[in-house]
Amino acid sequence: MTKALDGVRVLDFTHVQSGPTCTQLLAWFGADVIKVERPGSGDITRGQLQDIPKVDSLYFTMLNHNKRSITLDTKNPKGKEVLTALIRTCDVLVENFGPGVLDRMGFTWEKIQEINPRMIVASIKGFGPGPYEDCKVYENVAQCTGGAASTTGFREGLPLVTGAQIGDSGTGLHLALGIVTALYQRHHTGRGQRVTAAMQDGVLNLCRVKLRDQQRLDHGPLKEYSQFGEGIPFGDAVPRAGNDSGGGQPGRILKCKGWEQDPNAYIYVITQAPVWEKICDVIGETGWKMHPDYATPPARLSRLNEIFARIEQWTMTKTKFEAMEILNADDIPCGPILSMKELAEDQSLRATGTIVEVDHPTRGKYLSVGNPIKLSDSPTEVKRSPLLGEHTDEILRDVLGYSDAHVAEIHDSGATAPPRKQAAE
């Protein structure tokens, strides 16, 4: 079956997480992604957080499925020759180097356009143009500078980063959308273009409801936040609001049966207005249906702590799955707190390809996330990540059309192998 991005060839200069997230998505949709790696070492994540000695880490394997790997010393003249040929052949170049690295390699935007005017050059940086553009950024730095940390956690506690990789993987998702948009525009213009995504920008985009609330503060307190009901004044910036819902409909994480032993025996419950009377029935507070202090959403806002404490009395008598079954029967929005162990063992996620089992030649079988985006006419088959330089000869021959003699010449030049260490005299 033809894949959505069949015929698109991507030159992948990315490393660690943000860039590989982007290029893995493109590969899942059928693009031929050629990962260019440093001879002898490759992507640094091959050796980071290793759980099995001398085997590519899960950090690497889970971010580089469906790709091909070529090792190339881009400082070597023959290596530069190969890279130039790849730029001429590929549709997209993706990189998440520090600012200016690609230029110092001799491949400025102008040079790349000279080689291939149809080339799309996509870049992830920590910050956009401005006072911080030369600063190094990692996941948690992006969360802290993009508005996530200042609005995550509890009011009297430290700012917190989230377990979701919204800085790295989130920006990779944004860049992938930018790339396919640029590819579509190229059909009309015939020209390539630059696509950039800054990690700070990506995090802020995902925190848009907090920017919404920042402006609402100019007109009064945020009444759906817990501190309103507690009578605590608001400052001039959006506060941390614990587990309060950010969507305008009050919600909290509540204890369930077994919470004393199980750190994940909790459920999230939302007191949505259309199902308020059903909530009252479930928890045995039928008198609240018509009581002026509880009957309307505005009346309930100052009493949310009391209301959720009462709902929690009920949820503590049920397991999180029992509570979910009862609440869902009445269309009451809720969701159990699922551990990674529970998710890994969820057969429904296996059936949809959201979690997949992959077989690797040195690691063996392991679990990975699959493509979260499902296309009816372009299903994703998750294939293992490449070994370092596994496809070097294949790419030189099949993509660039080099003869056996030319391939041997490239190898003999040292362009595909780590530099030899000279013995001390």
UniProtKB/Swiss-Prot annotation:
The yes or no answer to whether the keyword Transferase is present is: yes
Which Gene Ontology molecular function entries are recorded, alphabetically? formyl-CoA transferase activity
Q: In which pathway does it act?
A: Metabolic intermediate degradation; oxalate degradation; CO(2) and formate from oxalate: step 1/2
Which amino acids does the record list as binding substrate?
A: G247, G248, Q249
Which positions bind CoA?
A: 17-18, 38, 72-75, 96-98, 104, 136-139
Query: From its record, what is one biological process in GO terms?
Result: oxalate catabolic process
Write down the chemical reaction(s) this protein catalyses.
formyl-CoA + oxalate = oxalyl-CoA + formate
Q: What is this protein called?
A: Formyl-CoA:oxalate CoA-transferase
Provide the E.C. number(s) assigned to this enzyme: 2.8.3.16
> What does the record give as the function of this protein?
Involved in the catabolism of oxalate and in the adapatation to low pH via the induction of the oxalate-dependent acid tolerance response (ATR). Catalyzes the transfer of the CoA moiety from formyl-CoA to oxalate.
